[in-house]
């Protein structure tokens, strides 16, 4: 159907914002409980070698419950076998429940993202300029559409015309509207599912239905199978080897036990095996990995894989853009500094002419400052032509109708431009350049043809608290490198004030890749942020690439993490989360292995009670049966008891690796020995009262 364009003006009925729904804990636990039973499928259980052995043991003791003499006379009753079976079954279920809860939280995030997607109608612009109302499912990449106040943007796209405020709270959770306009990579990118709350935009669709940003995020979050990280695989292999070794040890016990006339029942052998193998970390390992991705999601960051989250914890070098990460964002024109005898008004007029086609926030601030000083254009803008900034020339400007060329840019670039036209560097330029640089600002020179008129002072403000965050990273052994297009003096001042370890001035996009490659060649893992198309190669090269949701499609596709809030500083938080993931896994592994000591002292004396090794019963457990049941009950209950810690993570402290290791051994090693001794004794006392 064809129609004419009708533009709804601001001031109409206020649209109610949708908020990302939170997962209902009751529903989450109910689904996790059901999923725990589903995961008893042997095809699923075999993926976790530790819990698979417990599962097999459950089947065997279950058969012995039905027929205690199935494998010959064992000396254990059906009642005892049944109790062991129930305890082992719950051990497996608790491990499955931990994984299901972690997975459920990820699925809740996918549901929240999916809730932002609604089938809407869009006004598609046809070749003759007329409008056609179509369903959002019929839009294709390259289509041009019109969206007005109150409309939900039907697909990912790029703003071609117009300026409007967009409510992105459905995706980012941030209530403040975001200004969208053509020009810069960041401001011109829009995401399907967000809402126009003022004015009108003409957008070019950049993704087919089902292939937009939100669709990709949903696919990543609820992928059919979470791929394990290298460290997780290594730990799984270690646990599998330990399980095999202990299985061989247990399997070789019956002959010597029979020889000393102290036969051991199959049920007791299974109990010993379960006590020997590291069931605690085996039951929580998957949950820890999934929870790491979930903690990242709670920061409104979507990771493409657990590998990316884990890599954050191993990062040695952070490569950070100055603007937006270390400083508050867009530099703003503060004042003009005339040189070569020119007046302030003359500099303002040339700066206005050089910036009139510049749609960046910096360019607009120069225009505002010049107009505030009374500057006006002395040419017809329609007959002039804008010259865009490029990383190669490091300047931009305007070609005037009379053939004159006005330019603004890096001081050395403008010097070269003027000299190429027969001019020379004027007196006072170096002084103005140095003055701005020593203030930590960015100096831009402005010229007309072969004459430099003055310097523009662009002011940068360091983000509050950023120095302390860099100090924390330094204590963790992470090196920070600031990249900036500023000159060396300005870069040095800002680097010193911010507290970064190193900086690269007058950097180009190629420099980012070189820095990353140099660090990686030295065996370092590198993380960086980016939002523009020119950042995409470096984001792909980095071990951790964090793209901004407000950035270009190319940047988001190259990165392995996307920040829905578009906050570059969040990369520092991700390093902390990654280290917390590794520390949590290490702490619970230490605790699990230390637990085994108490379980040995409970079960081994019970197995060989007839040969007089009562001295090993240091916990004074009441009976062999009570000792076995107490150890197995503790073994089962410790898994759900540690689920909150596995999901939340061990509290992170910015310490060195040696300090973290010492603390890990003291808290989780010593604690892993003491806690089970106390708990098993208390359980034994409880059983004796029954």
UniProtKB/Swiss-Prot annotation:
Subcellular location, record wording: Cell inner membrane
Family annotation (InterPro entries): ATPase_P-typ_cyto_dom_N, ATPase_P-typ_P_site, ATPase_P-typ_TM_dom_sf, ATPase_P-typ_transduc_dom_A_sf, HAD-like_sf, HAD_sf, P-type_ATPase_bsu_IA, P_typ_ATPase
Region named Disordered: 1-23
Binding-site positions, ATP: 358, 362, 389-396, 408
Residues forming the catalytic site: 321
One of the GO biological process terms: potassium ion transmembrane transport
Positions annotated to bind Mg(2+): 531, 535
Domain of life: Bacteria
NCBIfam families given in the database record: ATPase_P-type (TIGR01494), kdpB (TIGR01497)
Function: Part of the high-affinity ATP-driven potassium transport (or Kdp) system, which catalyzes the hydrolysis of ATP coupled with the electrogenic transport of potassium into the cytoplasm. This subunit is responsible for energy coupling to the transport system and for the release of the potassium ions to the cytoplasm.
Family: Belongs to the cation transport ATPase (P-type) (TC 3.A.3) family. Type IA subfamily.
Full protein name: Potassium-transporting ATPase ATP-binding subunit
Organism, scientific name: Synechocystis sp. (strain ATCC 27184 / PCC 6803 / Kazusa)
Gene coding for it: kdpB
């Amino acid at each position: 159907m064809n129609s004419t364009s009708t533009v709804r003006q601001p001031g109409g009925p206020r649209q109610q914002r949708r908020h990302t729904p939170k997962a209902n804990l009751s529903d989450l636990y109910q689904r996790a409980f059901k999923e725990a039973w589903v995961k008893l499928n042997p095809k699923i259980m075999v993926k976790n070698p530790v819990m698979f052995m417990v599962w097999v043991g459950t089947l065997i003791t279950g058969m012995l419950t039905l027929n205690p003499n199935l494998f010959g006379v064992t000396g254990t009753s059906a009642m005892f076998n049944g109790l062991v079976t129930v305890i082992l079954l719950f051990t497996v279920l608790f491990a499955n429940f931990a994984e299901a809860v972690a997975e459920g939280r990820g699925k809740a995030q996918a549901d929240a993202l999916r809730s932002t997607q609604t089938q809407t109608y869009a006004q598609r612009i046809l070749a003759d300029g007329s409008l056609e109302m179509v369903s959002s499912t019929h839009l294709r990449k390259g289509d041009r559409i019109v969206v007005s106040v109150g409309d939900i943007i039907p697909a990912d796209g790029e703003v071609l015309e117009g300026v409007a405020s967009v409510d992105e709270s459905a995706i980012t959770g941030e209530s403040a509207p975001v200004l969208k306009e053509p020009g810069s990579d960041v401001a011109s990118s829009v995401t399907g599912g967000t809402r126009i709350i003022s004015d009108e935009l003409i957008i070019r669709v950049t993704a087919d239905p089902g292939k937009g940003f939100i669709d990709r995020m949903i696919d990543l979050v609820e992928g059919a199978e979470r791929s394990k990280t290298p460290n997780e695989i290594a730990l799984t292999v270690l646990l599998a080897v330990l399980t095999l070794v202990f299985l061989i040890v247990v399997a070789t016990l019956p002959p010597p036990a029979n020889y000393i006339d102290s036969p051991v029942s199959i049920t007791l052998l299974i109990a010993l095996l379960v006590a020997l193998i590291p069931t605690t970390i085996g039951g929580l390992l998957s949950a820890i990995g999934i929870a790491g991705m979930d903690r990242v999601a709670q920061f409104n960051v979507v990771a493409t894989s657990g590998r990316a989250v884990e890599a954050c914890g191993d990062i040695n070098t952070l490569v950070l853009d100055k603007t937006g990460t270390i400083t508050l964002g867009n530099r703003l024109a503060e004042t003009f500094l005339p040189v070569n005898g020119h007046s302030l008004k003359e500099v303002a007029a040339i700066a206005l002419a050089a910036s009139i086609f510049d749609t960046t926030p910096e360019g607009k601030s120069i225009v505002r400052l010049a107009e505030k000083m009374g500057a006006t254009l002395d040419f017809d803008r329609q007959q002039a032509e804008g010259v865009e900034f490029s990383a190669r020339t490091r300047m931009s400007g305007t070609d005037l109708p009379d053939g004159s060329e006005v330019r603004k840019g890096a001081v050395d670039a403008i010097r070269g431009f003027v000299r190429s036209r027969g001019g020379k560097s004027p007196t006072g330029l170096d002084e103005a350049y140095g003055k701005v640089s020593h203030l930590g600002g960015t100096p831009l020179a402005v010229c007309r043809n072969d004459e430099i008129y003055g310097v523009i002072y662009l002011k940068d403000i360091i983000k509050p608290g950023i120095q302390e965050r860099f100090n924390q990273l330094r204590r963790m052994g992470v090196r920070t490198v600031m990249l900036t297009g500023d000159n060396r003096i300005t870069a040095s001042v800002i680097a010193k004030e911010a507290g970064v370890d190193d900086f690269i001035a007058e950097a180009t996009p190629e420099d980012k890749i070189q820095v990353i490659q140099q660090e990686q060649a030295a065996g370092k893992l590198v993380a960086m942020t980016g939002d523009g198309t020119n950042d995409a190669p470096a984001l792909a090269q980095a071990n951790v690439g964090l793209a901004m949701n407000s950035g270009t499609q190319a940047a988001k596709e190259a990165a392995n993490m996307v920040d829905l809030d578009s906050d570059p500083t969040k990369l520092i938080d991700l390093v902390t989360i990654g280290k917390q993931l590794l520390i949590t896994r290490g702490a619970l592994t230490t605790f699990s292995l230390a637990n085994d000591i108490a379980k040995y002292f409970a079960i081994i004396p019970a197995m060989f009670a007839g040969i007089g090794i009562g001295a090993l019963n240091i916990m004074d457990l009441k009976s062999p049966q009570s000792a076995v049941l107490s150890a197995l009950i503790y073994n089962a209950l410790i898994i759900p008891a540690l689920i909150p810690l596995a999901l939340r993570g061990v509290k992170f402290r910015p310490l060195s690796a040696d300090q973290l290791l010492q603390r890990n051994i003291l808290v989780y090693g010593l604690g892993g020995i003491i806690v089970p001794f106390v708990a098993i004794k208390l359980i034994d006392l409880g059983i004796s009262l029954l």
